[in-house]
């Protein structure tokens, strides 16, 4: 039993010197330690020494030492039979010497220990610098893992994504004139999903417009001219956006890692050309040379300023192609969209104009000089590649058809509803896009499975031979 | 063969440009009056610093040369006062009405109307991108091939009603401001006949007169102009 039976520290005491409270020291009945204490006591006159003196004087200890409990009587027997741990003194908290600190218990004395210790020391010394570097890395990771990077891309001051609106013409026909079966639904789902993912990644707005046939206009053929009206409505809906990218439904963005800014708009002068003589499938006479026109209208490239480009289209083998084009918000664009459809022109020409707005635009480009200085063209494969079958069955025209090795941006399966398999094509291009844009882990897995497969095949071939 | 007169105005100086209708690429089957549109474009090319282009048919006389276009018509406040708003653009019963909230300095096209339609032989265009757009749109071959009954006048009335971007820059002003009639043929244009002090007198319809001819009608006014210049007025 501990000496401190009584609760009061004055008599029971003993906590000032931990050596005294342990009943294991000198449990022979002599409770006073007599001389050497394990921990030196700061003050000489302590309770213990006082008790010891009184015990000496008295001749017997001042409390009963007999029969103080089971553990007191049997402690030595119990403690000697308990398992012993090689708990060296130097490891205990109380030990002053601390011989084991800073040493690797298992690796003690080996070379690895020396290296690790040195490394640890270096790290400790450079802890502030390393903390800064670690902080930066964590911020970097945090930027990309959280939606922060998307906010950055979308904001108008940093990434500029909110300045772009993608207009996707969905629900073509709406099932009014023709049945819209599971294939059509699947094509629409794939196309919409592809554009949604792209717009979300780069912070663009996506406007999915319904192109179903509605009896909105007095003349039924006018219904297919909705591109112009839709573009006007969308421009009003997104007043902060600058560029509007029209996409037909049968298109697929093959490389979602290209942003529009980096792919086209950051260097518009290099990515577009204004002189249609560069590639002129319609043989439109250019530049205009009537003497009554001003210099800008007669120049082949307008005023040569990038800011004056308000409309970017591409040409395929047969003329202008409005499956994928860009329109900028400007007064010029407002006027173009206003004058594009006119009943006089429509009445005379709608039977000849198979491609409707496209042909009307070609006619306007040809005949109205105010249009030319503000229209630019981009190479077809920049954002409007064709699959084999459109503009050539073999798909080998390097100006027109999709080239996998060049990683073209977008495929426009134009005219697939006449004679080709739209669903098959979009499926094929989706798989191709997924394969081309695998992340490194998937590439590694595919490499392993491919090499196993080829090893198996070559083994089978050898077996067949022998 | 007729010639029309184009007056360019820049500050206080003005020059006159007489285009020849044969200079412009118009098909043989199209009436020659369409030539006035490329002619205005031509004038804009030849006089790159002129702001206002005042188109005037040859059968018209500027009776009061004291009046300048800037002050008499095109000045912002004056134009806003003169503008006739919220009336059918093409009388008598067009559903399209002129806009009522247009600012004077945004107007690029000033024209008058009589009771039958727009008066297309006397109008003012301000130089600019809109002017190029308007003239090129008006001159689109599809309008010419449509064979409007009154040629470019009907085409003008058509595009002004169908295209809001054109109507947004158009101002109608009272007819006597720049196209007073010498005689009211149809009887409906009361109050639009020429009075002393009017800017321009238009001899529209003088070639259809049975009893007299254009020279006959214009003669007294020529005399008046000559005497005016003699007296140094």
Q: Residues of each region from the PLM?
A:
Chain B
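Short amphipathic alpha-helical segments and helix-helix/interface helices
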Residues: 9, 16, 40, 96-100, ...
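Catalytic core and acceptor-binding pocket of nucleotide-sugar-dependent glycosyltransferases
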Residues: 38, 116-233
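Hydrophobic/aromatic beta-strand patches that form the interior of the parallel beta-sheet core
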Residues: 20, 54-56, 110-111, 171-173, ...
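GT-A fold catalytic core of metal-dependent nucleotide-sugar glycosyltransferases
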Residues: 32, 36-111, 115-117, 122-132
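N-terminal anchoring/stem segment of glycosyltransferases
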Residues: 1-50
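Juxtamembrane luminal stem/stalk of type II transmembrane Golgi/ER carbohydrate-processing enzymes
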Residues: 1-7, 49, 68-69, 75-80, ...
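Short loop/turn segments at strand-loop or loop-helix junctions that form parts
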Residues: 1, 20-24, 115, 126, ...
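Aromatic-acidic/polar surface patches that form glycan- and anion
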Residues: 4, 8, 29-33, 112-116, ...
